[in-house]
Swiss-Prot record:
Pfam families: Cons_hypoth95 (PF03602). This is Ribosomal RNA small subunit methyltransferase D. PROSITE patterns: N6_MTASE. Gene3D superfamilies: Vaccinia Virus protein VP39.
Length: 193
């Protein structure tokens, strides 16, 4: 018999390498939440290996925080987690406390990723951006536009985007597609601006 998931049932994500290798963190099961699988995460961080150390990262549409926690474990300088759902954002904060992360290393902002990115910036902030939005809402393209329009990206920033498989993605002309793979129902790509 299949177990019925309640909204506050807990799953977990595993950190696969770095300072907290093998550590498992609780994740609330929430509608639309799809933590990035270990194989995809391992491939992504193999791509990012030369760049992640001391980088400033944005985990947009953070959800489980799987990508941001992995970046912190691999010694990113700072990760900003954006999460709209207050309960999920609170779980991210608890996990950061469990890992003993300071506010200089990580912050959780309980706000829509798109609303956050609408704020124009005087100076760019991020070396690496993770975008893994809920599927079927075209949120990735909206977030990409806002990242560029509002000066969030440092020169040569790396932008990781997860979308539904076979969904064409419109990106700025000056972005270079560095890597692309598909698995199951997911396409994932790494760009550089």
């Amino acid at each position: 018999m299949k177990k019925i998931q309640t909204p506050n049932a807990k799953g977990e994500v595993r950190i696969i390498a770095g300072l907290w290798r093998g550590r498992k963190l609780p994740v609330l099961n929430s509608e639309g939440l799809r933590p990035t699988g270990d194989r995809v995460k391992e491939t992504l961080f193999n791509w990012l290996m030369p760049y992640i150390h001391q980088s400033e990262c944005l985990d947009g549409f953070a959800g489980s925080g799987s990508l941001g926690f992995e970046a912190l474990s691999r010694q990113a300088k700072k990760v900003t987690f954006l999460e709209l759902d207050k309960t999920v954002a609170n779980q991210l904060k608890k996990n950061l406390q469990t890992l003993k992360c300071s506010s200089e290393q990580a912050e959780v902002i309980n706000q829509s990723s798109l609303d956050f990115l609408k704020q124009p910036q005087n100076q760019p902030h991020f070396d690496v951006v993770f975008l893994d939005p809920p599927f079927h809402f075209n949120l990735a393209e909206q977030a990409i536009s806002l990242l560029c329009e509002n000066n969030w990206l440092k020169p040569n920033a790396l932008i990781y985007v997860e979308t539904e498989k076979d969904k064409p993605l419109i990106t700025p002309e000056n972005w270079t597609l560095l890597k692309e793979k598909t698995t199951g129902i997911v396409s994932y790509r790494l760009y550089q601006n």
